[in-house]
């Protein structure tokens, strides 16, 4: 796949503004001892991200991917950029293991890192081969603005040493993907490039991991509502931007 034209993807994505936020109000709601609201902290962040979350999981890119009608150009653009997250994403998972406060949580993050390093990375390589995208061609394709942003936010959250901030980014990165993948109609597309990307993000193990991420954020997030909200909303913005830029390139 030739690299010509990929630089046009660097246009910024504008016009997406999160709803207003009162930090003191949020802090008081989630620091009440015994409050059942802490069980729903992750859901509150998701609600605060609307309408961007819904726009992302219902984006035309996702709908066409699930239907198997997404153009190869858009899929190549998307996969090349997404594959570049893996290094930063593994750094983020490493930070999650380092900052988690339980042994069980560290084990879960370790197992997931193994899946990303193995099964998911292998999928990317198989998909690139099927789409005739050489390693040289991939190297000549520049990062888009959303890719730059994603790499930055993953490493930024990792360097905070805040388990809540790290969980906030992970909840978006994995939870939003489960949301759209679980909506895929049956049967799945015949092309494995589409079908396996869906099943990688909608299977029993992945659903269990996302549930774990939510429960961890519900548990520790209320103690740091501002930083969690900041990272969560910025990550949702980037997810929508990422779909939009790669979809637009194929048109």
Functional labels for PLM-detected ranges:
Residues 50-55, 69-99, 118-119, 168-178, ...:
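Alpha-helical bundle segments that constitute or directly flank the non-heme di-iron/ferroxidase center
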Residues 46-71, 89, 211-219:
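Short alpha-helical hairpin
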Residues 11, 21, 30-32:
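Low-complexity, intrinsically disordered or signal/transmembrane-proximal segments
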Residues 220-251:
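Long hydrophobic alpha-helical segments typical of transmembrane helices together
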Residues 2-14:
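Intrinsically disordered, low-complexity segments enriched in serine/proline and basic residues
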Residues 80, 104-205, 237:
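Active-site-proximal alpha-helical scaffolds that flank and shape metal-associated catalytic sites
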Residues 144-145, 206-210, 214-217, 235-236, ...:
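Carbohydrate-associated surface elements
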């Amino acid at each position: 796949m030739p690299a010509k034209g990929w630089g046009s993807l660097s246009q910024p994505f504008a016009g997406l503004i999160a709803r207003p936020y009162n930090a003191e109000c949020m802090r008081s709601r989630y620091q009440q001892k015994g409050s059942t609201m802490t069980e729903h902290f992750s859901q509150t962040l998701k609600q605060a991200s609307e309408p961007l979350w819904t726009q992302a999981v219902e984006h035309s890119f996702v709908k066409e991917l699930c239907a198997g009608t997404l153009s190869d150009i858009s899929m190549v653009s998307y996969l090349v950029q997404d594959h570049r997250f893996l290094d930063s994403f593994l750094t983020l998972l490493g930070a999650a293991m380092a900052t988690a406060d339980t042994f069980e949580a560290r084990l879960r993050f370790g197992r997931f890192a193994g899946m990303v390093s193995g099964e998911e990375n292998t999928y990317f390589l198989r998909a690139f081969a099927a789409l005739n995208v050489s390693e040289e061609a991939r190297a000549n394709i520049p990062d888009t603005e959303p890719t730059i942003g994603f790499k930055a936010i993953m490493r930024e959250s990792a360097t905070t040493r805040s388990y809540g901030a790290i969980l906030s980014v992970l909840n978006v990165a994995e939870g939003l993907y489960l949301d759209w993948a679980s909506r895929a109609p049956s049967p799945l597309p015949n092309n494995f490039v589409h079908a396996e990307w869906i099943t990688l993000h909608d299977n029993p193990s992945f659903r269990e991991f996302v549930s774990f991420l939510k429960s961890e954020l519900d548990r520790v997030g209320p103690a740091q509502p501002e930083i969690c909200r900041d990272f969560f909303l910025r990550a949702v913005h980037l997810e929508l931007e990422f779909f939009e830029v790669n979809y637009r390139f194929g048109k």
